[in-house]
A protein has these predicted regions:
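C-terminal structural segment of proteins
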Residues: 1-264
Length: 264
């Protein structure tokens, strides 16, 4: 049906973003294709060390899932604070990623966790890393005939620690920061910090990640420089959620907080 309707049709699941945009005449479609009743698209399961979440699983279902809580608590915690209770009850993970709203939580954390999505086209299926899926504000790399089927998240190794923190004044985050650290005793051997909501797409910085490697005491002294590198890479913008200058300040504050939380 999606291929048949082309640009006049749009997939519909929770509708928390899409219907609001249509209500305000920001988007217009002649056909909405309801995917909520497609079998298995709302399942949450573990497969060979990978957490697999169907695209129509709601934020609330993910938040409450015992599988998610036991295997990836950082994701369950993040979902607990997505938007408001109405959005969590109706909004879906696949819809969130597919709409590519810049002020959103999931893509930032999923990028740091190395997640990928499986998409089904008219004649073929393919896999896309989340950091390659989000191309810009409200823009993805999905083809016109593709359905986002599920999200696959590799579980962190026992030596890894992950944290996600955000700052928001309204219902959308001004900033979201995800941090994943690989530990060997007191040393951090690998680090990945991803900043979201301050600009169009979740962003990381090789320089910032390099500054987050070393002993805990060494890295603590380098957090300021790492935050500056991350801010330069993200290039925050002025918008309704805050000024670029304010967001740069928040990056420094929340990188330090995420570092402490990941190691606690």
């Amino acid at each position: 049906m999606l291929a048949e309707f082309g640009e006049h049709g749009r997939l519909y699941a929770g509708g928390t973003e899409l219907l609001l945009a249509m209500k305000h005449d920001l988007l217009r479609y002649e056909h909405l294709i309801d995917v909520k009743t497609i079998p298995d698209l709302n399942k949450i399961d573990m497969k060979n060390g990978t957490l697999v979440i169907g695209s129509t699983a709601t934020h609330r279902a993910i938040e409450r899932s015992s599988i998610v809580k036991q295997n990836l608590p950082v994701l369950a915690e993040m979902e607990t604070h997505v938007a408001n209770i109405r959005v969590r009850a109706c909004g879906t993970l696949g819809g969130n990623l597919g709409f590519a709203e810049p002020h959103s939580d999931p893509a930032t954390l999923l990028t740091a966790l190395g997640a990928k999505v499986t998409v089904q086209g008219k004649s073929a299926m393919r896999s896309i890393a989340v950091d390659k899926l989000i191309m810009g504000a409200y823009e993805t790399s999905l083809a016109g005939d593709e359905l986002l089927a599920n999200v696959e998240i590799p579980l962190p190794a026992k030596s890894q620690r992950a944290a996600y923190l955000k700052f928001q004044l309204k219902e959308r985050p001004t900033l979201g920061l995800a941090l994943v650290l690989d530990l060997d005793g007191d040393a951090i051997t690998k680090a990945l910090a991803v900043i979201g909501s301050v600009s169009a797409v979740p962003t990381q910085s090789d320089k910032a990640n390099a500054l987050l490697i070393g002993t805990r005491s060494q890295v603590e002294k380098q957090l300021g420089a790492a935050a500056e590198a991350l801010a330069r890479a993200a290039d925050p913008i002025d918008d309704l959620e805050g000024s670029a200058e304010y967001k740069r300040h928040l990056i420094a504050v929340f990188l330090r907080r995420a570092f402490i939380k990941a190691l606690s």
